[in-house]
Amino acid sequence: MRLTTKGRYAVTAMLDLALHAQNGPVSLADISERQGISLSYLEQLFAKLRRNSLVTSVRGPGGGYQLSRSMAAIQVAEVIDAVNESVDVTRCQGDRGCRSGEVCLTHYLWCDLSHQIHEFLSGISLADLVARSDVQDLVRLQDRRQGGGCPLPYAGKIEASAIE
């Protein structure tokens, strides 16, 4: 699979935004600190996310970013697509020139797998990820490391409607 750090970081940053947006806009500096992603890289990613209408920016004191739709309406595949990332597993990146301009024997197998991966990620929303207990555990750990920063309002599983 050719999913690089660009796609992984975009999904991580969007999940962080979804988890911390209940108190208003989230700054990229806060996401950078919590997730260990450079601020300049986040700025590049969020420019693409904004152009694709996944986030909106709020200027001024207390500004930052917000999801442009509910977290239940944003699919992981959309985030990956927005930053021009691919989940293509073919060697030829979907072109039919696998080898010397010809299709290789397994080309269609890898194309089918790429399609299945994209479909799988299209079926997972940010709300689905927020609701996962392993994500909740990691958020609590990150918040403790940050000195309590912005704890989530519920100790257990968070329903998407609690944050939206």
Curated annotation (Swiss-Prot):
PANTHER family assigned to the protein according to its UniProt record, in alphabetical order: HTH-TYPE TRANSCRIPTIONAL REGULATOR ISCR, WINGED HELIX-TURN-HELIX TRANSCRIPTIONAL REGULATOR, RRF2 FAMILY
Gene Ontology cellular component list: cytosol
Organism listed in the record: Azotobacter vinelandii
GO molecular function terms noted in the UniProt entry: DNA-binding transcription factor activity; double-stranded DNA binding
Pfam families on file: Rrf2
Keywords of this entry: DNA-binding
Domain HTH rrf2-type: 2-131
Protein name per its UniProtKB record: Putative HTH-type transcriptional regulator ORF2
